[in-house]
Amino acid sequence: MLSSLLRRLARALFWFAAGSIVLVLVFRWVPPPGTALMVERKVQSWVSGEPIDLQRDWQPWESISDDLKVAVIAGEDQKFANHWGFDIPAIQAALAYNERGGNIRGASTLTQQVAKNLFLWSGRSWLRKGLEAWFTALIELFWSKERILEVYLNSAEWGKGVFGAQAAARYHFGIDASRLSRQQAAQLAAVLPSPIKWSASRPSAYVASRAGWIRRQMSQLGGPSYLMQLDASRRP
């Protein structure tokens, strides 16, 4: 009986691995029609009885402001061009900080955030973290850095029911994502850690301060020219 259970488990793991690989490969070229986070928000609205209108309009790489691309990297993952999905020093620093009793501090890279938002549910269980690591590795293996950032920018949450750069630009500033200024891009990047609580168009003192820090980091990275580095390390 035990051997039968083990065989069934092995088959289940095989088909899960095969299915997830196929899914990641498909999304290498095909825009994801939605995300797990969007489904989660919709379910939460049904449970609470508060209707939510999900806004999302996929935009290709060239239709998104370069300033927003750099601002997101500056604010969320400055080692994005160099790592393979995991920022080990940042993870170690976050673990040490949390062990000292501070507020829970994360160290997720942009790739990890894409894996979580696209495929998984919210939470901090070891199962979810393990699946996040699996999908992160697959994404880094099969996608370019440009594709990872493109999917992130089209999937990130920027307000209640607001997903992706185009919906965010229209919701907060009434313009297309391609026309975002450096300041507007920094404000959008500044609210990513808490997009429901914070507003990019009506920034609190903290958000304004964080946006200023992000602008300085954008300059240190080299501005839009930094984007040329994204896949340089992967070229033969």
From Swiss-Prot:
The chain crosses the membrane at residues 12-31. GO terms for molecular function: pentosyltransferase activity; peptidoglycan glycosyltransferase activity. The keyword Cell wall biogenesis/degradation applies. It catalyses: [GlcNAc-(1->4)-Mur2Ac(oyl-L-Ala-gamma-D-Glu-L-Lys-D-Ala-D-Ala)](n)-di-trans,octa-cis-undecaprenyl diphosphate + beta-D-GlcNAc-(1->4)-Mur2Ac(oyl-L-Ala-gamma-D-Glu-L-Lys-D-Ala-D-Ala)-di-trans,octa-cis-undecaprenyl diphosphate = [GlcNAc-(1->4)-Mur2Ac(oyl-L-Ala-gamma-D-Glu-L-Lys-D-Ala-D-Ala)](n+1)-di-trans,octa-cis-undecaprenyl diphosphate + di-trans,octa-cis-undecaprenyl diphosphate + H(+). It is found in: Cell inner membrane. Its EC number is 2.4.99.28. GO terms for cellular component: peptidoglycan-based cell wall; plasma membrane. Keywords: Cell inner membrane, Cell membrane, Cell shape, Cell wall biogenesis/degradation, Glycosyltransferase, Membrane, Peptidoglycan synthesis, Transferase, Transmembrane, Transmembrane helix. The keyword Protein transport does not apply. Peptidoglycan polymerase that catalyzes glycan chain elongation from lipid-linked precursors. PANTHER family: BIOSYNTHETIC PEPTIDOGLYCAN TRANSGLYCOSYLASE, MONOFUNCTIONAL BIOSYNTHETIC PEPTIDOGLYCAN TRANSGLYCOSYLASE. Belongs to the glycosyltransferase 51 family. This is Biosynthetic peptidoglycan transglycosylase. The lineage of its organism: Bacteria, Pseudomonadati, Pseudomonadota, Gammaproteobacteria, Pseudomonadales. The gene is mtgA.
